């Protein structure tokens, strides 16, 4: 009997990607986060679609429409909080996924890695424009502050900002276009994710040892489908605990105050997942310098394959590099904490030191440590 799974043009693609895909036999739970990101994206698109059915992108009614969703729409409150906290889950999975790539040297798959960095930028852009939509105080002022950073670009900066705003300030035109961007970008992310997978399946997955695993492959289904389902269950457990018990734990109280252009909140800050980049931005007193540092903090990931000086791919057998990696993680957590603090002593100094350390570890210390390890192993 002909197996339709292996002959049908569409089924064949699914089969080669999720069923008969040869996968390394030793990949750990750190490899679960790719599939979790896919689930997060599907969840965000579905909850977002239902929210968009009731949302109005007008400055006069946006805040009221979000209130209406929570109060009057059947299960609107759970859809809204699943969407808001789903974004947090998305970024937790993203950061772990990128961290896994750094630790195990997955960045040597150049095309996959570069598309991953583009995906990271796109997801960050989507989250930013989405944060503006409820039109609370933090939405309005966050949009004003972050879009204003583009005015630091020499010569065209001011015109560029006014072009993005659609006027001389963040207003109705800005909200409408941000809603349009927020609707289209997830589908662009989905398309990019498919390209990401396409390039990954050209080379096959990396594994914790960083050694080619062609001699020892197992089919993706049932082994890793079961493993992924376990990860998905944990994801939903964590998400629904957050949604049902502490839906506003990760949010800012100012988003429950309607936007008021005449009243600036005491502390303008983005959602928690942008705080590390915000801290780097604030640690440089110059506007253009801050913007460049902000962009560089993410763009630096593109340099990772070229900064790899070790003879080994993974950090699994490199204890000094491992220590440095965890110092980098601690540094990013410090930056996240600093980003949420007011701009005053000692937070300014801590932020500046943490920002310098971030770039120092990636650009200097990691390549140097790898070279030292090579020499110690007489390679």
Curated annotation (Swiss-Prot):
InterPro entries the record matches: Cyt_b/b6_C (IPR005798), Cyt_b/b6_C_sf (IPR036150), Cyt_b/b6_N (IPR005797), Cytb/b6-like_sf (IPR027387), Cytochrome_b (IPR030689), Cytochrome_b_C_euk/bac (IPR048260), Cytochrome_b_N_euk/bac (IPR048259), Di-haem_cyt_TM (IPR016174)
Chain's gene name: MT-CYB
Keyword Metal-binding listed: yes
Any one of the GO BP annotations: mitochondrial electron transport, ubiquinol to cytochrome c
Membrane protein topology class: Multi-pass membrane protein
Keywords, ordered alphabetically: Electron transport, Heme, Iron, Membrane, Metal-binding, Mitochondrion, Mitochondrion inner membrane, Respiratory chain, Transmembrane, Transmembrane helix, Transport, Ubiquinone
Cellular component aspect of the GO annotation: mitochondrial inner membrane; respiratory chain complex III
Entry-linked Pfam families: Cytochrom_B_C, Cytochrome_B
Family: Belongs to the cytochrome b family.
Subunit structure, as described in the record: The cytochrome bc1 complex contains 11 subunits: 3 respiratory subunits (MT-CYB, CYC1 and UQCRFS1), 2 core proteins (UQCRC1 and UQCRC2) and 6 low-molecular weight proteins (UQCRH/QCR6, UQCRB/QCR7, UQCRQ/QCR8, UQCR10/QCR9, UQCR11/QCR10 and a cleavage product of UQCRFS1). This cytochrome bc1 complex then forms a dimer.
Organism: Dama dama
GO MF, one annotated term: metal ion binding
Secretion signal, residue range per the UniProt entry: none
Described purpose of this protein according to its UniProt entry: Component of the ubiquinol-cytochrome c reductase complex (complex III or cytochrome b-c1 complex) that is part of the mitochondrial respiratory chain. The b-c1 complex mediates electron transfer from ubiquinol to cytochrome c. Contributes to the generation of a proton gradient across the mitochondrial membrane that is then used for ATP synthesis.
Superkingdom: Eukaryota
The protein, known as: Cytochrome b
Note on how the cofactor is bound: Binds 2 heme b groups non-covalently.
Residue ranges of the TM segments: 33-53, 77-98, 113-133, 178-198, 226-246, 288-308, 320-340, 347-367
Binding positions for heme b b566 per the UniProt entry: 97, 196
Binding site for a ubiquinone: 201
Cofactor: heme b
């Amino acid at each position: 009997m002909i197996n339709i799974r292996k002959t049908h043009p569409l089924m064949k693609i699914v089969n080669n990607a999720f069923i008969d895909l040869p996968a390394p036999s030793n990949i750990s739970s750190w490899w679960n986060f790719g599939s979790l990101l896919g689930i997060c994206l599907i969840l965000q698109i579905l909850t977002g679609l239902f929210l968009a059915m009731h949302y109005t992108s007008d400055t006069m009614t946006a805040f009221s429409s979000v209130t209406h969703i929570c109060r009057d729409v059947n299960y609107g409150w759970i859809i809204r909080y699943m969407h808001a906290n789903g974004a947090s889950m998305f970024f937790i999975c993203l950061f772990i996924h990128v961290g896994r790539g750094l630790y195990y040297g997955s960045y040597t798959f150049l095309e996959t890695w570069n598309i991953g960095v583009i995906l990271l930028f796109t997801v960050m852009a989507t989250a930013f424009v989405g944060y503006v939509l409820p039109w609370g105080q933090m939405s309005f002022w966050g949009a004003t502050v972050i879009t204003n950073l583009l005015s630091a670009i020499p010569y065209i900066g001011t015109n560029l900002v006014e072009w993005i705003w659609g006027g001389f300030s963040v207003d109705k035109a800005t909200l409408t276009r941000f809603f349009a961007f927020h609707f289209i970008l997830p589908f662009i992310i989905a398309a990019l994710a498919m390209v990401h997978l396409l390039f990954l399946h050209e080379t096959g997955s990396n594994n914790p040892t960083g050694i080619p695993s062609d001699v020892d492959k197992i089919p993706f289904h049932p082994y890793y489908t079961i493993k992924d389902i376990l990860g998905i269950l944990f994801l939903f457990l964590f998400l629904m605990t957050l949604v049902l018990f502490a839906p506003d734990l990760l949010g800012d109280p100012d988003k429950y105050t309607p936007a008021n252009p005449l009243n600036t909140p005491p502390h303008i800050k983005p959602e928690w997942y942008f705080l590390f980049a915000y801290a780097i931005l604030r640690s440089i007193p110059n506007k253009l310098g801050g913007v460049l540092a902000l962009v560089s903090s993410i763009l630096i990931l593109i340099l990772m394959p070229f900064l790899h000086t070790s003879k080994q791919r993974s950090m699994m057998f490199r204890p000094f590099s491992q220590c440095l990696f965890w110092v980098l993680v601690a540094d990013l957590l410090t930056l996240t904490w600093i980003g949420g603090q007011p701009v005053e002593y000692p937070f300014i100094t801590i932020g500046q030191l943490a920002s310098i350390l971030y770039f120092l570890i990636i650009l200097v210390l990691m390549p140097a440590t790898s070279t030292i390890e090579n020499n110690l192993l007489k390679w």
